[in-house]
Amino acid sequence: MKETRKDIDFLKTIAIFSVIFYHFFDLLKSNLLSSVTLFEGGFLGVDVFLLISGFLICGSIVSKLNTDSFNLLQFYTRRVTRIYQPLLVFCAIILFIGYFILFPDIYKETGREVANAIIATANFRFANSTGYFDLESLDKVLLHTWYIAITIQFYLICPVILVSLKKIFKTNFNLSVLLFTTLLLITAFV
């Protein structure tokens, strides 16, 4: 059985409630109270989830690489199954219902969004379109798939980097991971 980390559970709880309260108070602001400013940054809870996921996945991979029990194919198979089964069902439902209720031009756009969701490039598509919080974004049923795309991209890249570091720096693997992470953080702020 997996060991639970209370500190990470606490961060997840804060992230969940910050997103929920953000949406709740945003709804109040747009419908009832125009001066409500509580939880304006609550959407950052999504970023916290990305960080937590990255931390946990990298930690798990590093741990398995240290014991030579990491299987890249098995890792990808589990992730693809976990992510793509519900995503494909959701996309099929959206396309089916959309066929009957959407205008043809919006349906075509939705079809393109479905394609981007499936090939994990929705984050690029939506980053180059309307703002996430703009009124036009209300028409984008798959706008939330930017998160799934980033997650998939991370799952594709992270294990390959870690496996490569393990092969290159056999004896100093943990140090190489630390140095790589440090360099990555430095470049993120430059």
For every predicted segment, state its role:
Residues 1-190:
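Membrane-interface helix/loop caps of multi-pass membrane proteins
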